Design a protein with these regions (language model features):
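N-terminal regions immediately upstream of nucleotidyltransferase
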Residues: 1-36, 64-65, 81-84, 140-149, ...
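Short linear motifs at secondary-structure transitions and domain/linker junctions
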Residues: 25-28, 43-51, 87-92
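Generic low-polarity alpha-helical segments
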Residues: 28, 39, 50-52, 71-74, ...
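Active-site nucleotide-donor binding segment shared across nucleotidyl transfer reactions
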Residues: 31-70, 75-80
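Short, isolated positions within intrinsically disordered regulatory regions of eukaryotic proteins
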Residues: 42, 77, 93-95, 138, ...
Length: 173
């Protein structure tokens, strides 16, 4: 089914699949691809937090926005050098309930964009506070843009599905 925006609900199982597929994409790059140079500085398998962001996160919360694509962000503690913040990795989420976007050539499902950030201001073992610190206090276009839409935690597992931000409103679930 080709449709610009899927209105299918996003479930906890979908969030888990998005996390699993996205971390696998990063592991592929950072452990056996061109990103191997970061392996000594960053444990890609242990982010401070991972989150579904932007339009799909809005749809998870409000059930109205629809899903054009999925944006999954990983946040790591800064360690000597920043991770490549301009890189975007992609993979094909082929869950049939979401269909495919007609303009995304080469995808049989919805495109997933995977992004990473290394951040200096964070709170260990508190992903909600870490995300609030990033969204409210980092002076970056990424933080501002994410805060204007929505952020739903994917990791750590104990926080899966927690909405921490929706249209510049911050929640402490």
């Amino acid at each position: 089914m080709e449709i610009e925006r899927s209105i299918a609900p996003i479930t906890i199982e979908d969030l888990n699949e998005l996390y699993t597929g996205s971390i696998a994409r990063l592991i592929d790059y950072y452990h056996s691809g061109r990103g191997v140079k970061w392996k000594e500085l960053y444990n890609i398998q242990k982010p401070l937090a991972a989150a579904l962001c932007q339009g799909a996160a809005m749809h998870y919360h409000d059930k109205e926005n629809g899903v054009k694509d999925f944006d999954v962000w990983f946040f790591y503690p800064f360690n000597q050098k920043h991770l490549p913040y301009r890189s975007i990795w992609n993979w094909d989420y082929t869950n049939p309930k979401f269909g495919r976007h007609p303009e995304f050539e080469g995808y049989s499902g919805r495109r997933v964009d995977v992004l990473v950030r290394s951040i200096k201001n964070y709170t260990h073992n508190d992903p909600v506070k870490t995300m609030h610190q990033f969204l409210q206090h980092e002076n970056t276009s990424s933080a501002r843009l994410l805060g204007k839409k929505a952020v739903v935690l994917l990791s750590p597992e104990s926080s899966l599905g927690k909405v921490v931000c929706y249209k510049d409103s911050y929640f402490n679930p």
